[in-house]
Design a protein with these regions (language model features):
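N-terminal, motif-rich segments that launch catalysis or mediate targeting to/interaction with membranes
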Residues: 22-168, 175-339
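Bacterial N-terminal signal peptides
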Residues: 8-18
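Bacterial N-terminal signal peptides that target proteins for export
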Residues: 1-8
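Extreme N-terminus of proteins, especially the signal/transit-peptide cleavage junction
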Residues: 2, 19-23
């Protein structure tokens, strides 16, 4: 067994600058949603579809651009998972207006649990690094599930909440959405915003660590392309990913997680441990080498390569997280939707 896998196994036994909203990109989120879709019975699919037709952007986004060979039910349900990213403002050239972007809630996509570089533990001892009162993904998931369960919630609000549940269960399984790396340098004394300020190279390409993990299941760099052709292509890519993962056999440790870890907090804790053990670690178990990267702007040329071992391990980790997200989300939806 390699040093890296020994280190990961050991970890498995443990159980105001805006942050980028994306976790898995559109391909990853829709792959989760497709796995969910295939696990729901016809009754739950019908409930979901009926509810989604009350969504304020049903015609404009959820049902838009559907290919002839995909049912409206499947198309709309799978696309719920990316609506919370679609409403994100796109800058000065965004012509969609407040009718779309007012639904954007960037703080709901993540939780910044501090991961302190072990060599600097004494420096940060006893310090409060993250405001405990900040709204985060755990609060958002609890609130959205309650909205769907509550009989007096209007259907339009339930439809919006369903989209958030689909999306955030995917987000919470992305390790870099559950962490902020700290060390005693001027660049990371306030954290790296979940890898958004941490530059590396992967396969020769400079990339922020957060973005690298976002794109592990497939690249959707042109996320603002709303054309029917582009949306159909991303949908097909997501279905390919879902098909490739459908037969993935989870290891005993992952099966145990499915049985034992049933709360949003436990899912987030899993992701945090993986961020520490895999996301920010080299193949020898040392802290991953990176360079400080600006929140906006180019990543410095000095960004170091993560290496083949890191790439393989990260990909395998992402695949397992997608499968866990799909299975857990399907079961959670059955609970909140009822029979």
């Amino acid at each position: 067994m390699s040093h890296r896998w020994k280190f990961i196994l050991a970890c498995t036994l443990l159980t105001t600058l805006p942050q980028a909203a994306y976790a898995w990109n559109s391909v990853g989120h829709m792959a989760v949603a497709k796995l969910v879709y295939d696990r729901l019975d016809d009754g739950h699919k019908k409930k979901l579809f009926t509810l989604l037709q009350s969504h304020p952007h049903y015609e404009r986004y959820l049902a838009a651009g559907r290919p002839d060979n995909v049912s409206e039910v499947e198309w709309a349900i799978v696309r719920t998972s990316v609506w919370p990213d679609w409403v994100r403002p796109r800058g000065d050239k965004d012509s969609r207006g407040a009718e779309v972007t007012r639904y954007h809630r960037p703080e709901d996509h993540y939780v910044n649990v501090p991961f302190i570089d072990p060599k600097d533990a004494a420096v940060f001892a006893g310090k409060t690094l993250i405001d405990p009162d900040l709204t985060n993904i755990l609060d958002a998931l609890k609130q959205r599930c309650n909205e769907v369960r509550t009989k007096t919630t209007a259907d339009i609000d339930k439809a919006i909440a369903v989209c958030w549940i689909f999306h955030l269960v995917g987000d919470i399984h992305q390790p870099l959405h559950n962490v902020a790396y700290f060390n005693d340098t001027k660049d990371y004394r306030r954290g790296d915003l979940g890898g958004n300020l941490f530059g590396v190279r992967a396969g020769g390409q400079r990339v922020k660590l957060r973005a690298y993990w976002d794109n592990l299941l497939g690249d959707d760099s042109n996320y603002a392309d709303d054309s029917a052709n582009h949306q159909a292509r991303i949908f097909r890519e997501a279905l390919k990913v879902a098909d490739s993962l459908r037969g993935l056999q989870l290891a005993d440790a992952e099966q145990k997680k499915l049985a034992d870890n049933t709360t949003f907090k436990s899912w987030s804790q899993e992701s945090f441990e993986l961020a520490k053990c895999v996301g920010y670690r080299q193949s020898d178990g040392k802290i991953l080498a990176g360079v400080p990267a600006p929140f906006k702007g180019p990543i410095p040329e000095a960004a170091p390569e993560v290496g083949d071992d890191y790439i393989k391990t990260a990909r395998a980790t992402a695949e397992v997280r997608i499968v866990l997200a799909g299975q857990r989300l399907a079961e959670r939806l059955k609970l909140v939707l009822g029979k």
